[in-house]
Amino acid sequence: MIVGHGIDLQEISAIEKVYQRNPRFAQKILTEQELAIFESFPYKRRLSYLAGRWSGKEAFVKAIGTGIGRLTFQDIEILNDVRGCPILTKSPFKGNSFISISHSGNYVQASVILEDKK
């Protein structure tokens, strides 16, 4: 049974402005593994990756119903499976989780569905 669904839409240029003012912003949002992937990319790809992880994590906290505050960005990790699809590899949710991240132009959208294991 679906117990939560969260959606987030983010402008990549807004993330770029924050990142330009404070490059440590990436360290606040990304886990160590996510940060290692981020640092392997050229600048423009870094921005879309960072915006995608931001949006995915925002969608997750909307789905679980806590918002950022009770959870931190470090409590949630989004990596890619062998096919390159994003997966939630770390979160406090014990059921099944499904994530989709899409980029189009200056926008990134993420959707997270949480499902009870029952």
UniProtKB/Swiss-Prot annotation:
Top-tier EC class: transferase
The organism's taxonomic lineage, starting at the top: Bacteria, Bacillati, Bacillota, Bacilli, Lactobacillales
Record organism: Streptococcus pyogenes serotype M12 (strain MGAS2096)
Family indicated by similarity: Belongs to the P-Pant transferase superfamily. AcpS family.
Pfam families documented for this protein: ACPS (PF01648)
GO cellular component: cytoplasm
Disulphide-bridged cysteine pairs: none
Record keywords, A-Z: Cytoplasm, Fatty acid biosynthesis, Fatty acid metabolism, Lipid biosynthesis, Lipid metabolism, Magnesium, Metal-binding, Transferase
E.C. number(s) listed in UniProt: 2.7.8.7
This protein's name: Holo-[acyl-carrier-protein] synthase
Binding, Mg(2+): 8, 58
Location in or out of the cell: Cytoplasm
Coiled-coil segments: none
General function of this protein: Transfers the 4'-phosphopantetheine moiety from coenzyme A to a Ser of acyl-carrier-protein.
Record-linked HAMAP family: AcpS
Gene Ontology biological-process entries: fatty acid biosynthetic process
Reaction catalysis annotation: apo-[ACP] + CoA = holo-[ACP] + adenosine 3',5'-bisphosphate + H(+)
GO molecular function, one term: magnesium ion binding
Cofactor(s) this protein cannot do without: Mg(2+)
UniProt-listed NCBIfam families: acpS, pantethn_trn
